[in-house]
């Protein structure tokens, strides 16, 4: 998917000719799977010999989700010999894993249940690739995908979109941001897009992480129940709203001006299909010149890739989110995106949003179940809006 702008709208419909744009081009990812357990019959000391995550889930389909959580401090190792343990970027309980390093922790599971795993980690200057690792429960891989996991980095534009002497625009170089990040382990390599879960019996267990590509600093690993995204009705009921629907002018965000992105390949692109596709340096498109007026296309197609934007909201109120987009590659199909607001998917309406095939540019306001625009409550000030590639409902089919 590629696009040129977000628009944070008054709680109303979007005009297809408003010049806000977004485009969706997507390829089907390679097959893979993942999740974890300490008691699965398919567990193995070799990831290649372990069962698939699909079979693992089937094996534990009647086991309950955890209602309690346990946090492992990364410096609380069984054996810290040869590892760098201590303070890193204002956090004092961390461990650095270089390539091929392993770390093992002992922890107590408070209940017999299925647990998700969330890493609090820091990127380290290296080759700029995704950080890959494996994990084992009690010395075994619970399923094959536990042998192939990855965590994303964060990138920003190193400068602005430049205009050359011939009028063509040049995309800026990408610069990595080294910072603390949080990610729940998900299956971004297969057809499922599932959150990886592990089955743990109540009691003591060990958890081993081995870095296989790129170094990584770990702060904490949290085992917890799978997050439940509320329905739109539940979300609205949970908001302590002090204002009504926003009725001002739309807040337009150029899609090519992402605040951060998950991959260095996500650079401003160009569109020559629509004359009204605006850019940061021009309100009109050009058939003759390269104007960096979109973001995405084929470089934004793999589950887990994301783009984030900062929006400055003028007043408290209820807002809808619209995207002008082009999705002209997956004929007869839709591609899907999750939308996060300040780090969370607000409601199920913002999960797995369909961007359907169209040979021309189209506009979409995130819809509710009845087709009318769904809404989010924003307070005055800055907020983060993030779009993430997901297979959405297609994962159930695949």
Feature map (PLM): residue ranges:
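Sec-dependent N-terminal signal peptides of Gram-positive bacterial secreted proteins and lipoproteins
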Residues: 1-9
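Extracytoplasmic
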Residues: 13-398
